[in-house]
A protein has these predicted regions:
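Bacterial Sec-dependent N-terminal signal peptides
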Residues: 1-30
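Acidic (Asp/Glu) and glycine-rich low-complexity loops/linkers
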Residues: 19-132, 140-151, 159-169, 186-189, ...
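Short, surface-exposed interaction patches in beta-rich subdomains
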Residues: 161, 178-282
Length: 282
């Protein structure tokens, strides 16, 4: 009898939830906010779909959302920062519409979390960019110069990102993924941890400081580096392209493959390998 009661309670809750979803007003509404306001920092959360368009002529925010979300919208501007999210946690139906399009001349700080999907459109003329992705957020596109500090956490993903500037710092952890083009005329710093993965499509830099650990994988064969210091450890793998000096360590059942004809000064333990890149090992 007790099992039957639990069964009917579960069925009742499922039916109640289904009825509530059917009662939601899914009409798509549109709203324009902050026309002409300067926006240089954007924070988004709660699984919003956010498109950021580089627009030198006008600045505003377009919202497209399901009508039932009206009372929960939390889209505010505090100084130069735009915040996009909801006022409370919502268990949303799969067909819920929650899109934001931000037109702005330049951005200096981006913070995406809680499964936000972001798209960057255009060349952004910021002197410095700080960008962080958390909680399985994803970001695609965008072109930046100057200096950039990028951090990806908690299985976040960044693809088709283009940096062509002075200095770039990139940190990935917790199975995060980066794919993009990197050129830094001064230097770059790249660190991967906890099964993260990085692949570059091209680029150059005179100096690169690289760390790859905890079953992570780095492929920079298409980015030409003059001098690189790299530490590969804890069952990780790195593929690099170095023309000058290659220094560092390879430890803990790890592998380092290199392209080019560098001067090598790398300490390698007995369980790890360092060898030239060839068709047989890549």
């Amino acid at each position: 009898m007790k099992k039957q009661s639990i069964f009917w309670i579960i069925i009742g809750l499922m039916l109640f939830s289904s009825c509530r979803d059917k009662d939601l007003d899914m009409t798509v509404l549109h709203k324009t906010l902050f026309d002409g306001a300067a926006i240089t920092e954007i924070t988004a959360e709660d699984a919003w779909n956010v498109t950021i368009v580089q627009d030198a002529e006008k600045s505003f925010v377009e919202l497209e959302y399901s009508a039932f979300l009206e009372e929960y919208l939390r889209v505010v501007k505090e100084g130069p920062e735009l915040k996009i999210g909801f006022s409370r946690y919502l268990n949303l139906p799969a067909n819920t519409v929650k899109n934001a399009i931000v037109h702005t001349a330049s951005v200096q700080k981006l913070d995406f979390s809680e499964a936000v999907t972001a798209l960057l459109v255009g060349d952004f003329p910021a002197a410095m960019l700080e960008m962080e992705l958390d909680d399985a957020a994803t970001c695609k596109g965008g072109s930046f110069g100057g200096t950039a500090f990028l951090k990806l956490n908690d299985a976040s993903t960044m693809v088709d990102f283009c940096f062509n500037g002075l200095f770039c710092s990139l940190k990935l952890d917790d199975a995060s993924v980066f794919k993009g083009f990197l050129t830094a005329t001064d230097s770059m710093s790249i660190h991967l941890e906890d099964a993260s993965r990085l692949t570059t499509y091209g680029g150059t830099t005179p100096v690169a400081i690289v760390g790859v650990r905890d079953s992570s994988h780095l492929n920079m064969v298409k980015t030409t580096v003059t001098n690189m210091h790299i530490n590969v450890s804890a069952v990780s793998e790195a593929v690099v392209n170095v023309s000058g000096t290659l220094s560092g360590t390879v430890t803990g059942v790890s592998k380092l493959y290199y392209q080019g004809n560098p001067i090598i000064n790398v300490d390698c333990d007995d369980l790890s390998t360092i060898e030239p890149l060839s068709s047989s090992n890549f």
